[in-house]
UniProtKB/Swiss-Prot annotation:
Gene Ontology CC terms, in alphabetical order: plasma membrane-derived thylakoid membrane
Gene Ontology molecular function: oxidoreductase activity, acting on NAD(P)H, quinone or similar compound as acceptor; quinone binding
Keywords for the protein's UniProt record, in alphabetical order: Membrane, NAD, NADP, Plastoquinone, Quinone, Thylakoid, Translocase, Transport
Location in the cell: Cellular thylakoid membrane
Superkingdom in the source lineage: Bacteria
Organism of provenance: Prochlorococcus marinus (strain MIT 9312)
InterPro entries for this protein: NdhM
Membrane topology value: Peripheral membrane protein
E.C. designation(s): 7.1.1.-
The name this protein goes by in its record: NAD(P)H-quinone oxidoreductase subunit M
Keyword Membrane attached: yes
Amino acid sequence: MEKMLLKSTTRHVRIFTAEVVDNELQFHPNKLTLDLDPDNEFIWNEDSLNEINKKFNELIKERAGKDLDDYELRKIGSEIEGLIKILLQNGQLSYNPDCRVMNYSMGLPKTNEVL
C-alpha cells in the first residue's frame, strides 16, 4: 500500500500524519503534526499554547492503538477547535486586530459593554 499523508483541516486547526523535516512535512504513520491558527486570527500567549498542546497530547494518548484515519483526525481537530472557543470566551485568547480578515469566526469578543 502506498504511503499517504492524511490531514484534517478546520478553520483554526490543521493536523497531518507527518513530521516536519527540514521545514517540510514528511509522511509518518505514527506521528501527528499540529498547525495551529494558520491565518493568525488570534493573539496567543504561552499559557494558551501550552493548554492547546496539552489537550492535543491527551487526545493522541486516548487514541493509542487506534488507526490514525480521517475520522480520528477530524475528532481531534474538532476538540481542539472547541478548546480554542473556550479559551476565547474565558479571555485567555483574543482576536488579532492585525489579522488579514476580521470575521469573528468564534463569536463576537466580549467587552464590558456587551457583558
